[in-house]
A protein has these predicted regions:
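N-terminal intrinsically disordered/low-complexity leader segments
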Residues: 1-9
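Hydrophobic/aromatic-rich alpha-helical bundle segments in the mid-to-C-terminal region
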Residues: 3, 121-125, 143-192
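Residues in soluble alpha-helical coiled-coils and helical-bundle/repeat scaffolds
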Residues: 5, 51-55, 66, 77-81, ...
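Helix-turn-helix
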Residues: 13, 17, 21-55, 59
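Solvent-exposed, amphipathic alpha-helical segments
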Residues: 13, 17-24, 71, 75-78, ...
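Hydrophobic alpha-helical connector segments
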Residues: 59, 73-103, 154-161
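Short, basic, alpha-helical segments at the C-terminal edge of helix-turn-helix-like DNA-binding modules
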Residues: 62-68
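Amphipathic alpha-helical packing segments from all-alpha helical-bundle domains
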Residues: 74, 99-105, 118-144, 156-159, ...
């Protein structure tokens, strides 16, 4: 039994090291050897658990996806209407930018890689669908949303909200104007309400 625990710890250590390397240097700038060296394991151990960089990144993505879904759900579950849902989402993205930019950078890198790697594209599509569904489900608590939707489905509205906040967050994290960085997220909140 101790052997299984030890193997799980090695696998988890590799995964956490990969998350750290990928979120600080990006997919294109990290090799399996970099991850093995930083994790303090032999390259053969890393390939035993994860076979190749794509499979390892896929596992890192799974961890990231679980974290995003859980945090967004936790942020908006207490909202009483669509306005509070949107305010909670804006607050989530602000906190993500300020407190956990590595997670956002990893999400951005994942999005870029998904353009070229089919397995990442499938995962990202699944993540966006899950996030859209969470937002949509929470928007439906507000019956006023259907009166303001101008004939668009709640799913389309949820996709617009997610796209606006994710895209604006990318601009903020890449931007140099830190003084007024969050004005655009505040504006998105005002426009979406």
């Amino acid at each position: 039994m101790q052997l299984k625990i030890s193997k799980a710890n090695i696998s988890e250590k590799i995964l956490m090291t990969a998350f750290e390397c990928l979120s600080t240097r990006g997919y294109a700038n990290v090799s399996m050897r970099n991850i093995a060296d930083n994790a303090g394991v032999a390259l053969s151990q890393l390939t035993y658990y994860y076979k190749n960089k794509e499979k390892l990144f896929t596992e890192v993505i799974n961890v990231m996806m679980d974290q995003y879904l859980r945090e967004i759900e936790d942020n908006i579950k207490s909202a009483k209407d669509a306005k509070e849902v949107i305010a909670s989402l804006v607050r989530f993205f602000k906190e993500l930018i300020m407190d956990n930019p590595k997670l956002l950078r990893l999400f951005i890198d994942f999005t870029a890689q998904a353009l070229w790697i089919p397995s990442f594209r499938e995962q990202l599509d699944g993540l966006f669908n899950d996030l859209t569904e969470i937002i949509e489900r929470n928007l439906l608590i507000d019956t006023k949303i259907s009166n303001r939707s101008l004939g668009y489905s709640p799913k389309s509205i949820a996709k617009l909200i997610l796209g606006a906040l994710f895209g604006t967050s990318i601009q903020i994290i890449l931007g140099t104007d830190k003084e007024s960085a969050f004005e655009s997220l505040n504006l998105a909140e005002s426009l979406l309400n």
